[in-house]
Amino acid sequence: MGFFIQHGLTKPEILYPFLFGIFAVASLCIATLLFPASFSAASRVISWVLSIYLEVKNPIRHTETGRNIPGPSYVWPNGQGDIEKYVQGRSRSEQWQRKYGNVYRIWAGMTPEVVLTRPEQLHAIFKDSDKHTKATNSDSGYFMSRILGQCLGLMAGPRWKLLKGIAAPPFMHPTAVRSIGRIQEHVRAHFHDLETNGNLREGRIHPVQDLKMLPFFIVAEANYGSLTPAMKSELDSLAPARENLMKFVLFGGLARFNISRFFPTEANRQLRRFRSQWRAFNRAAYERAREKHPSAMVVQMYDAVHKGVLTEEQVAQTMDETLYANLDVTTGGLSWNLVFLAANPACQARLHEEISALTPAEEEGYISRNGTYLAACVLESSRLRPALPFTIPQSAPTERVVDGYRIPAGTNYVVDTWGLNVRDEFWAPDNSTYRPERFLNSSNTDLRYHFWRFGFGPRQCIGRYTADVVIRAILLHLVKHYELQMLEEGDFTQDPECWITHPDLQVKCVRRT
């Protein structure tokens, strides 16, 4: 009330119309979220007003010309997130860079994000990535906060270091290498099941639908120890529900705002159901693992909760991150390999020749090595089909200058992975061609800041070593025992509803004789 008293606004004839005006504007905004088709004209007016306000509130100017940083205007309610940024990201990446240049600004909700497209921009930003702060809820709004807002990947500072110390050991390089034999057992069992009960009986394989749960259950064992059939069944049954929740995040609208929690929406009903089931599963898994697998990650996590070091919400969301969130990422990293090998028989033949020369005893060492043709194939696939069109936003602790634009401390950055991995002249002249050989003579120093896969600088994805050995083990088995061929000619079909780049097609997969 101090503001109203100071400015003489406490008289009813002034205060009531003022409050009514605020209520009317708020009601109109909510109406555009609940009934967007009926209030499209109002949405355009709100977009125009907020775009002007946000430009004034978040100035980023060129140090010499004073010109404001270019970029698309804010659009109510989502800005350019998350549909344009992720689902339509491949096409937007090219359009935006062509229209706005090599550095520009987009809006994730009402939060500005500076887009980087060039290798030379990245060193100045990511040299201290361990000191960066991940964007609150990944700039995806309230609904995201209820799924992954407190997970390890979105933490920073002491909390991140503490939780990383608990979550990272099962996924570090020595542990990943020691697990290769166990991973190969999972792979053999999975393909036996596909041949007995799946599409493989008919000589076909869907790179996503037929393989996505294989790496999922391998990681689940690292989290919980050995899994009972009932645990596998419950994890499997939760996957579609969790996948559907991400669609509410992607499409935004009302779910982006805190006020959405007061509405009886289908999104909130599904969220409550999933959170209850997920928490119950993890509690039961903890009690079982305490007896049978005391070193399992779930035991270390819940022990930290009981000591008051972590909250159960942080544990539940981090376990979700390692499984369901990374299910999409690992599936994307694996599945495109099948498509590219099927579409490039000469590369597949070379890989088969290299694998065929191995004895069974040599396979584990081969899977763990980085300089192989298999490793090169995995890298080339991830170059041409980066998991995310734009990276998860994060901010640097100090002011930076990028291409002459002075970026204030705390501003979020994202990297255009298509601009970096594919369109950059570093990969010329055959930027869009699948040619794994390009990685055989490339060192990590050569590739630094030219190639995005697991992040940049000191802070990278903790699951990168496990992801590599899992993908390589699956591809080794696949190419050793089967020949892949394309069933259809033309451009590769992509799942239009997935925020991660996934193929949506079947590949011919015939057992070798």
Curated annotation (Swiss-Prot):
InterPro entries on file: Cyt_P450, Cyt_P450_CS, Cyt_P450_E_grp-I, Cyt_P450_sf
Q: Which family does it belong to?
A: Belongs to the cytochrome P450 family.
Which residues bind heme per the record? C461
PROSITE patterns the record matches: CYTOCHROME_P450 (PS00086)
Which residues are reported to be glycosylated? N258, N370, N431, N441
Q: What is this protein called?
A: Cytochrome P450 monooxygenase asaD
UniProt keyword annotations, A-Z? Glycoprotein, Heme, Iron, Membrane, Metal-binding, Monooxygenase, Oxidoreductase, Transmembrane, Transmembrane helix
GO MF terms listed in the record are: heme binding; iron ion binding; monooxygenase activity; oxidoreductase activity, acting on paired donors, with incorporation or reduction of molecular oxygen
Q: Is Iron given among the entry's keywords?
A: yes
As for subcellular location, the record says:
Membrane
This protein's membrane topology, according to the annotation, is:
Single-pass membrane protein
Principal place where this protein is found? membrane
Q: Which cofactor does it need?
A: heme
Q: What induces it?
A: Expressed during the earliest stages of maize kernel infection.
GO CC terms of this entry: membrane
Show the PANTHER family listed in the entry. Answer: CYTOCHROME P450 307A1-RELATED, HEME-BINDING MONOOXYGENASE FAMILY
> Which E.C. number(s) belong to this protein?
1.-.-.-
What role does this protein play?
A: Cytochrome P450 monooxygenase; part of the gene cluster that mediates the biosynthesis of aspergillic acid, a hydroxamic acid-containing pyrazinone with aliphatic side chains that originates from leucine (Leu) and isoleucine (Ile). Aspergillic acid has antibiotic properties and was shown to be lethal to mice.
Native organism is Aspergillus flavus (strain ATCC 200026 / FGSC A1120 / IAM 13836 / NRRL 3357 / JCM 12722 / SRRC 167)
Concerning Gene3D superfamilies, the annotation shows: Cytochrome P450
Highest taxon of source: Eukaryota
**Segments passing through the bilayer:** 14-34
User: Which CDD domains is this protein grouped with?
Assistant: CYP_GliC-like
Top enzyme class, one word, equals: oxidoreductase
